[in-house]
Amino acid sequence: MSYNKLKALEGNIEAISTALAIHEERRNATTAERETLSKFTGCGGIKEVLSIGTDTPIPGTMQEAVKRLLSVLSKAAKGNETLYRQVLQSLKSSVLTAFYTPTFLIQAVAEQIKDTFTANDLKMGTFLEPSAGIGGFLPVGDMATHRTAFEKDLLTGLVLSALHPDTQVFIEGFETIDSQETEHNRFDVIASNIPFGDFRVFDNTFSKKRRHLCTGFQDHP
């Protein structure tokens, strides 16, 4: 089945609107709302988003959906122009990287991890998803597993929080983990689908302490 940009964008708008309502009402999502939230796929490949606020015309088939998107973004910003620009820029920045892992691949990875733990009589106490999206890998653990997730995109993080209320969610880049008040600083399993792209993320700690690791190899017996 070919990718339908309009259908994907409309699904994203519904998911964002639902997440906003859940956040404002301080409650958990209903079963129907969870279904809506799970359809969020980000704006990867929806290049029309990049045309918002520019002179580049948006195709007629996408104009109405883009208008609805802007209305939702305005509601999310609550009249704060600075926040509105941040949300919009965050959305635009995701166009080149926000591509979600197919469910069957996540299930295959999850089953392999679970089988490994079961075969070795191990318990998964902590789990980290460092580039979570809407948390595709979070079900890897069991009911007793403490989950932590990082997602730097503002709107995606909002959906993630609504979809996984029992997960400690940080709407920040994973490189900020040392400055966050995580409940755990060691994890039994770390799994995620890291965004592809030739982009460098500034990590001050890495720059100062780990840069030499990228400049050569050492062979230790």
Region locations from a protein language model:
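Class I S-adenosyl-L-methionine
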Residues: 2-163, 167-168
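SAM-dependent methyltransferase catalytic-core segment centered on the flexible catalytic loop
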Residues: 128-221
